[in-house]
Amino acid sequence: MKRIYKAHILYTKEQSRFEVIENGYVAVDANGCVLGVATDLASLNAQCTTSDVHCQESEVIDFGDRLLIPAMNDVHVHAPQYRNQGIAMDLELLPWLQNYTFPEEMKYADTAYAERMYRRFVHDLWRFGTMRACVFATIHTESTRLLMNLFQEAGMGALVGKVAMDRNSPEGLTESVEEMAQGYEALIEEFSHPSPLTSRPSLVRPVVTPRFIPTCTPEMLHACGQLAAKYQLPVQSHLSENKDEIALVAKLEPDSTCYGDAYHRYGLFGQTPTVMAHCVWTEGEELELMKRNSVMMAHCPTSNLNLASGLAPVRMFLEADIPVGLGSDISGGHDLNIFRMMVYAIQVSKMCYQRNHDHRFLSLSEAFWIATKSAGSFFGRVGSFEPGYEFDALVINDSDLNHDHYSLLERLERFIYLGDDRQIEHRFCRGEEVGEPQTLRT
C-alpha cells in the first residue's frame, strides 16, 4: 500500500541549496522508500512509474501548514554516558575519561541499571527527532544486546558497538581479545540478518568499535580488524581529538606515520565503512588517507568545545570531499539535539573563518545537508526525499514560533535555532511512524 503525505516539504539534494516545495506531496511505497516528490498529484503519479497503483488511488495524509523534513542522524554518541550529561565540563579529555566516564560505564555490567538508563537514552533520541544513530555501548555483551533490542522495540535505526578495550582502563572495564570476539560473534549472529520481508539490512546492526588506540592493544586492534573484514561490518572510533591523546598514540604505535595510519594498519580505517569522531587536529597525510578511504568525519562541536579539544575545520573536510556527519557525543557533548549541533557547527565554522578567511563558514543548507543526507549515507540511502531513499522524516508544527510572514525556509531556520522537541509532531523511520518509546518509571 502506497501512502502519500502532503505538507511544506524541505530537504537538501546537495549541500549548496534547499529543495522547497510549498504544499507538496511525497509518495512512499510499502517498503518505506520514497517514490517521488511533486507539487501536485498528477506530477507525483507520473513519477511513480514502478508501482501498479496510481497515486490518485492511494491514501493521502494531509499535514496542512506543517513542515516535512528528513529526520536527524547522529553519527557519534555514547549511550552509557547519558547520565553524565552536563557534568565534569571543566576537564579535558583524558582526566575526564578516568574520573567520570569510565566509572559510569562500569555500572553497565548491571543490566537493570543499563535498562533504566538506555530506555531514557532511546526516548531522548526519539524526542529530538533522531531516527538513526551510530552508538557506542560498553564492553558488556548483555547490556549491549539490551540496547540493540530497545532500538528494535522502538522501530528506530542504530549501528551499536560493543566497545573493545584491554589496556589503560580500570579493572572491570577491560576484557580479553577472546571475550571481545565471542561477544561480537553472538551479537552478529543475532542482529546481522536482513529483513525477511524486504531483504534490506536490519534497522539495528553491530558496528565494530575499538574505543580508541590508547585503550586497545595491537592484538585487540588486529582482532577488531578481522571481525570487520570477516563480516563486512562498519567501524567506528575516535581520531585526533586532543593533542595529549595524539602524543600518546605516537608512543604506543611508533611505526605508524599518523594516528589514522595506526588504525589503517589493523584494517580499521576505511577497509569497511568507517566513521571517526572529532578529527580536530587531522591534517596532511591523515587527511589524505581519510579521503582515499572515504572515512567519514563525525563532527562533534559541543564536545570539542566542552573538553577544550579545539575547533574542527569542517570546511577543510568538505573541500577535500571527505564525508561529514554530526555527532552529539554525549557526554563530552551536553545535548542530544542534532538541530542544536547544526547551530554549533555553523558557529564553530564562523570562528574558524575568523582565523582563516580562505575557509568560508557553513551555510544553513550545508549544515542541514551534513545532518541529513551526508550523515544518513552511513546508514544506507537515508537523509533525503529523493526517489529510492528510505522515508525517515519529521513533521514540524512551528505555529507557536510566530511564523506569520516568514518564508518556508525562514520558518525552518527559526525552528533550527529557536525550536525544540515540542514542535516535532510526527516521526518516521523507514516509512513507519515511530511512537513514543517506553521508559521505566522507577
Residue ranges with predicted function:
Residues 1-48:
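N-terminal metal-binding scaffold of metallo-dependent hydrolase/deaminase domains
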